[in-house]
């Protein structure tokens, strides 16, 4: 099988790049990760949104972030402040730039640029995943030795995918 990276994009490739550009632009404004916490003490649950224009925000008009920070204190986790993460300031800008790149590439129909932009976006996704994993690891494992509640061997790193039970929280 021989690949041809020269010439113009096909109509279907153009459409896919336009759709990718639109969805990438939308993702710049929405949270990319959500943590839901429920426990007998919090039957209504708490929500933490990560990503989008707000960076890090809590449900219940921001009150959930305050409550989560209070609970984090008891197990020795650091407080979560939106300003602590430069990535959330940069993320909407980077996603917006990729959206524009996808749309421009679709309209100029350049195969090489389309391949380069998709590879760049893939690399960005992998690096973002690694960075996000690093932050969750740091927050979940670097616990204060002065924490009021200590559970030997317990880490509080939230899963990037899926679910995890943390103490009484589902």
Residue ranges and their predicted role:
Residues 29-86, 133-170:
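Long, glycine/tryptophan/cysteine-rich extracytoplasmic
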Residues 6-22, 110-123:
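Alpha-helical transmembrane segments and their helix-start/interface "positive-inside/aromatic belt" motifs
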Residues 12-39:
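Early transmembrane alpha-helices of polytopic membrane proteins
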Residues 26, 122-132:
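Aromatic-anchored segments of alpha-helical transmembrane domains
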Residues 28-31, 103-106, 129:
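Hydrophobic membrane-targeting alpha-helices
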Residues 1-13, 95-112:
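Cytosolic-side transmembrane helix boundary signature
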């Amino acid at each position: 099988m021989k690949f041809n990276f020269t010439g113009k994009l096909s109509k279907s490739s153009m459409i896919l790049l336009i759709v990718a550009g639109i969805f990438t632009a939308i993702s710049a404004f929405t949270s990319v990760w959500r943590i839901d916490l429920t426990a007998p003490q919090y039957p209504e649950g708490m929500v933490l949104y990560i990503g989008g224009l707000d960076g890090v925000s809590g449900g219940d008009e921001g009150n959930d972030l305050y409550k989560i920070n209070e609970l984090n204190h008891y197990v020795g986790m650091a407080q979560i402040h939106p300003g602590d993460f430069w990535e959330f300031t940069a993320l909407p800008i980077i996603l917006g730039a990729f959206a524009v790149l996808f749309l421009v590439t679709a309209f100029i129909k350049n195969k090489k640029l389309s391949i380069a932009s998709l590879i760049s976006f893939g690399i960005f996704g992998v690096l973002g995943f690694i960075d996000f994993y690093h932050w969750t690891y740091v927050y979940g494992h670097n616990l204060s030795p002065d924490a009021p509640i200590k559970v030997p061997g317990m880490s509080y790193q939230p899963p990037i995918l899926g679910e995890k039970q943390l103490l009484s929280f589902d």
